[in-house]
Regions:
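Non-catalytic accessory regions of SAM-dependent methyltransferases
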Residues: 1-155
Length: 155
C-alpha cells in the first residue's frame, strides 16, 4: 500500500474518535483480515472512494474522496463547514446512531479499561433539539511569521 492510492472501501466500524474504519482486502498487503484505514466523515455502511494519506505498519489513514453508496444512517450535516473544521465529527450520522455510538464507546471503555466484563450501559438519553449546543472547543496554538497564532485546522 502506498500513499495517494485510491481504494473503494465499506465502512465496517467507528474508531473511538468517530472515524470510519474500512478494510482494504488485497492479497499483496499480507493481511488476510484486511488492512484497516481510518477515514474521517464516514458512517458505518458507507461505501466510499478513499485516498490513502498516511501508512503505518498495521493501519493507515484515508481521506474521503467520494461516497459511492451512502449508509442508511448518513445525513447531510447541518453545519456547512463540518468537513473542513473537524469540530463536529459525528454530524454526518443520524442522531440515533450518534447516541448508539456514544453508548458503545462507554461500554467498550468500561470493559477494556475498567475491566468490567458483564456491564450493560443503558441507552444514551437524547435531546429534543440536538443541535447548536456545542460546549467544547479545542483551539491549537502555534507560531507563524508574525508570532503566536491560534485557530482551527481545516481538514
Amino acid at each position: 500500500m502506498k500513499k495517494n492510492q485510491d481504494y473503494i472501501v465499506t465502512i465496517e466500524d467507528l474508531s473511538v474518535e468517530g472515524e470510519g474504519i474500512g478494510k482494504i482486502s488485497e492479497g499483496e498487503l499480507g493481511n488476510e483480515n484486511g488492512f484497516p484505514l481510518f477515514i474521517k466523515d464516514t458512517v458505518i455502511g458507507d461505501v466510499a472512494k478513499v485516498r490513502v494519506i498516511k501508512v503505518k505498519k498495521n493501519y493507515g489513514y484515508g481521506r474521503l474522496m467520494e461516497i459511492i453508496t451512502p449508509s442508511p444512517n448518513r445525513v447531510k450535516p447541518l453545519c456547512p463547514v463540518a468537513r473542513q473544521c473537524g469540530g463536529c465529527t459525528l454530524q454526518c450520522m443520524t442522531y440515533e446512531e450518534q447516541l448508539k455510538f456514544k453508548r458503545r464507546k462507554v461500554e467498550n471503555n468500561l470493559r477494556r479499561i475498567g475491566g468490567l466484563k458483564d456491564i450493560e450501559v443503558p441507552m444514551t438519553l437524547g435531546m429534543e433539539k440536538p443541535w447548536r449546543y456545542r460546549n467544547k472547543a479545542q483551539v491549537p496554538f502555534g507560531f507563524d511569521k508574525e508570532g503566536i497564532c491560534a485557530g482551527f485546522y481545516a481538514g
